Amino acid sequence: YLSWMFNGMRQFIAVCMILLCFGLLLRKKYVLTILVILLASTIHASALIMIPLIFVIQGRAWNWKTLILMMGVGAAILLIDPFTAFLDAALSETQYSDLVTNDIWKNDDGTNILRALFYSIPAILSLIGRRIVTRENSPVITLCVNCSICTAILYLLSVFSSGIYIGRLPIYTTLQGYVAVPWLI
């Protein structure tokens, strides 16, 4: 129990470090942001998921990059067995090298669908109010909306795969969704 608790604490420290980079993302200071992400990954390796995501979340809300990410996750869900083989190969040299082959992954039935739906509310609200989000074109809100879309996509993937491993990745983009919710309502 203690190892899981301390692992969660380490991950949240990494999340907070990356959240501090929000202003850097708004100013498109990618090199500095990546350096902070790499520093955060020394605390928790899952922080590395943010390196590709910082490029996905840039631009207009519901842009082509987020749609491609949606299609990629949809394909991963449909092809879950090859996806887990890819994940196992990708993580082979990290602290998560036994991720796919261990008993926890095999016995994990994924994230609860209600949890995934709850955390998808900011993305759903932004889809409903897409015209308003596009018209306002606020850099803060578009970045937060795109983070919300990534949160929904990652939670959807965790419903069909591992709630313990994949289900903890959305925390890196969930907090920005909380910024968007009051604006979207």
Where in this protein do the model-derived segments appear?
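Transmembrane alpha-helix boundary/anchor motif
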Residues: 4, 20, 78-82, 152, ...
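Alpha-helical transmembrane segments and terminal signal-anchor/GPI-anchor hydrophobic tails
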Residues: 58-171
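Membrane-interface alpha helices of multi-pass inner-membrane proteins
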Residues: 1-4, 32-56
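Short acidic/glycine- and proline-prone juxtamembrane loop motifs at membrane-interface regions
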Residues: 5-12
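Hydrophobic/aromatic-rich transmembrane helices and adjacent perimembrane loops
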Residues: 165-183
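Membrane-interface transmembrane helices that cradle and orient dolichyl/undecaprenyl
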Residues: 18-31
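Residue-level signal for the membrane-embedded core of alpha-helical transmembrane segments
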Residues: 13-16, 46-47, 176-179
